[in-house]
């Protein structure tokens, strides 16, 4: 069963590593470079130095590891084995991937590891523990742990998946020891770099405490990510398959920093507490253009600075089936005449209205651990949509449909709602899930299958100059997210019920860990649904501070963003140096809750000044750069008084100012 689940992703990876027809190094990555026991990819390097697993991982010139990655095995007496033999070598290498083989040994136990490192830096590891010399039976082994010792300065932030949307607990600062049940993806890093461990299944993980499968243990010399592979004696040879990937995965595309994207419908329709009624009828782009006055609305959007329009699910009558009504092509053409690019919605569901439903519902839908299909969405025309799993033949059907629509409609990209997320699935018909000794089913996460589907879509779209925009709230695993150009994150903060205080919950460290993009390798836009206590101005106060634009939902919400986009474009933030508030050389400010991030050029700067306190107003005095001669509010043009080498601003709670500075 497990072997069948891995087949799609494993076969594609093997073909790529062998240089099979169709394999290629996609832009902006560079070919793999391999030496005797080290592998380099764009911006990163993995060295093995006679060890089964990496002894050194470097990202952007920075060492991530404090010591070699460890396989910790204990003997029957509880004492850790001290490996007496070790070695590694590069077995094979092409431009697309390299295979590294490594081993550790004591007389009673052998550890063998094969690591395939692909051009985007994804390292897929098969780690096997077998009987040692002279015996075919496991003996003298009472535990197996994987320990990844990271430099403390390279592991100040964390994020993991899957997560609950009820409370923002899966991201933040590493402040002390943490322990969790199985997580399919765990990233540790800082504002610039990081390392992700990911795994599709907990089938072979035998932790004594199911709530401590994964641990993070900070220390003065190293911060350890520990995975409990086995907390008891192994009775037979065992192999664990997992992945490692250093981030960022690719060069940060500064062109996408300024946003100027509008999500065409007023998002949040039908979500309790947001006060937006879901439509009860269907026509093409009903929520985006309820009056049908497309020409006027699109022209106003273009004048307001919009560069890209994203049409949500109602561009098509059948969910996740990119076969629109004939009138949609005219809408795409109208956008193009105004210089607007068009992205369209695709997602993660299969509808009973889809002509492929009868042929696919049994073996292509995602099932929960009880064997039930999963659905929490319905829409017009009347249909209940079910979560699909892409670890099966439907991935090929979906890809073919997407490519056909892209070409026929002249699209500029896709907005992928959850597609990049390997969703939990236990459908045995296509190999997902596993059954324990008591007969209970468990879900698995098809990371490698989704990765190969995303790689194929990225190759197609990127070759045509298009954009893949991934919506993935709560999920930042680079194995799949690398094959997107941007991501839209934040829905988990907006949809949960109750009196949720988002401004208090979303601390700065959490934003830097998940929502910033730079440390993961692609631009992020922040998602905010307006509701009492959480408006666009609130979202902008924290997002702009981190170099992230909040995306407006609905054409009616474009006007407040127009002066922001104009200020960024006029200054040229895409080619300016960026000095964030956490940098050692950050702009000096005398108010504790006021932070300043700066875009800088030789002749001046654009400051984002934010009061991040949810409750307290602040008056802040800011130290001006040497030679500053004038300051203005970049949104309104208002002149701001400069005196004594400083600027004083008053800010209400969770509000910001954009300040343009000029030098002599």
Residue spans for each PLM region:
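Carbohydrate-recognition beta-sandwich/jelly-roll modules
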Residues: 40, 46-60, 65-76, 83-86, ...
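Surface-exposed beta-strand/loop patches in extracellular or lumenal glycoproteins
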Residues: 137-151, 612-627
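C-terminal beta-strand-rich structural cap/linker in extracellular carbohydrate-active enzymes
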Residues: 239, 643-664
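Active-site-adjacent "subsite" loops/lids of carbohydrate-active enzymes
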Residues: 290, 328, 332-333, 342-409, ...
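Aromatic- and acidic-residue-enriched carbohydrate-binding clefts of CAZyme catalytic domains
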Residues: 310, 315-324, 355-393, 422-451
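Aromatic-lined substrate-binding rim segments of carbohydrate-active enzymes
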Residues: 316-346, 442
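Active-site and adjacent substrate-binding regions of carbohydrate-active enzymes
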Residues: 393-477
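Active-site-proximal substrate-binding groove within the catalytic cores of carbohydrate-active enzymes
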Residues: 446, 451-626, 632-635
